[in-house]
């Protein structure tokens, strides 16, 4: 049996098997995150106890001490985005200047690296700010999964177009695989955001709602391969691509020093990417007589994003035009994330909430 779901002119084909597999993966990941945070939180419970004048441990309060607390929370989360359609504008020096209308995007949340993020929040009473780095995947509908892997029942989309392709009127509708061999952001539709938060009065001693809005930058890993073109014309690199913002609402559960949350996010980002015909820079590309390759290899992946962004900056500074052209689109998504982390009390309130016997 196959269930078809249509929303905003987007059709999804969901089988009971695929839905069950996705739920099992999400449950397993959430369980690992929650278990790890519970272990950290329980290990810190004794640190939260204060002593009275006789040296006896005092009991902690039921959790109401967080109402006006100054504290810092570091956490990680997992999620799966639902993308909306968007126009895709492509311009290349071969006479291509076209718009692909309302292209669809899919995620591949549980293919490594798993979709999610990491963040740090500093609260001062009921207001706070958050630095949030989020990694999701976004893949054009070419009948493939992340990194071009084979998937069952893959859908190749036909889209309406305007403009020119290779100097001639673009065909409309266009079968996407006639243009792209790969068009995706699978090492990340990455966004880095600074958000302002407000948390409301606790619903219970341990559960508290919050809202937030944030602005930042999109830093996707652009993978753009065109059908029939040589390997050295493929773009595979991180780029600063434009502004991004998010709106969020969630519920936080406290257990000792543990912070667990269920959160809704709406994320929008603008992507204006250069088609450079290059791959990500890493330490493996460094020619050195005094740094052996066995030393460089373990750190090579960590240098790809900063190396690519530095190359992008030098191209911008020199006025160098991308040799293969450029494209522009937007990505907007809804998602529910599940996460957990650890709470560090602020100095002024580290002993707050202790109850004398």
Q: Over which residues does each language-model region extend?
A:
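Membrane-spanning beta-strand positions in outer-membrane beta-barrel proteins
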Residues: 73, 128, 208, 259-261
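Bacterial N-terminal signal peptides
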Residues: 29-38
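Outer-membrane beta-barrel translocator domains and adjoining extracellular loop/strand segments
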Residues: 86-92, 142-148, 221-232, 273-280
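Flexible, solvent-exposed coil segments and beta strand-coil junctions
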Residues: 95-101, 169-178, 223-232, 314-321
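Short glycine/proline- and aromatic-enriched beta-strand/turn motifs that initiate or cap beta-hairpins
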Residues: 43-124, 290-357
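Residues on the lipid-exposed face of transmembrane beta-strands in outer-membrane beta-barrel proteins
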Residues: 76-78, 118-122, 192-200, 205, ...
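Gram-negative (and chloroplast) outer-membrane scaffold detector with strong preference
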Residues: 121-226, 344-347
């Amino acid at each position: 049996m196959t269930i078809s779901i249509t929303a905003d002119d987007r059709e999804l084909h969901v089988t009971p098997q695929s839905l069950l597999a996705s739920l099992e993966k999400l449950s397993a990941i959430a369980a690992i995150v929650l278990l790890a945070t519970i272990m950290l939180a329980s290990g810190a419970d004794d640190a939260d106890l204060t002593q009275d004048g006789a040296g006896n441990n005092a009991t902690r309060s039921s959790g109401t001490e967080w109402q006006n607390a100054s504290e810092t929370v570091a956490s990680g989360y997992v999620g799966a985005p639902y993308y909306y359609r968007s126009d895709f504008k492509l311009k290349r020096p071969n006479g291509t200047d076209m718009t692909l209308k309302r292209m669809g995007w899919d995620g591949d949340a549980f293919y490594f690296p798993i979709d999610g993020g990491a963040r740090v929040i500093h609260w001062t009473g009921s207001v706070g700010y958050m630095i949030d780095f989020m990694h999701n995947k976004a893949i054009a509908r070419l009948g493939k999964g992340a990194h071009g892997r084979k998937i069952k029942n893959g859908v190749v989309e036909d889209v309406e177009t305007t403009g020119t392709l290779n100097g001639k009127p673009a065909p409309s509708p266009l079968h996407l695989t006639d243009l792209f061999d790969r068009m995706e952001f699978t090492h990340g539709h990455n966004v880095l955001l600074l958000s302002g938060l407000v948390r409301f009065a606790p619903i219970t001693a341990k559960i508290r709602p919050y809202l937030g809005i944030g602005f930042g930058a999109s830093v996707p890993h652009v993978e753009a391969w065109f059908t029939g073109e040589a390997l050295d014309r493929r773009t595979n690199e991180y780029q600063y691509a434009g502004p991004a913002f998010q709106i969020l609402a969630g519920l936080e559960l406290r257990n000792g020093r543990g912070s667990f949350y269920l959160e809704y996010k709406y994320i929008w980002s603008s992507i204006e990417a250069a088609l450079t015909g290059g791959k990500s820079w890493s330490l493996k590309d460094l020619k050195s007589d005094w740094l052996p390759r066995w030393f460089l290899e373990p750190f090579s992946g960590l240098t790809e994003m900063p190396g690519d962004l530095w190359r992008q900056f030098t191209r911008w500074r020199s006025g160098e035009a991308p040799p293969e052209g450029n494209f522009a689109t937007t990505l907007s998504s809804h998602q529910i994330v599940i996460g957990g982390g650890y709470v560090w009390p602020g100095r002024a309130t580290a002993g707050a909430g202790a109850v004398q016997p």
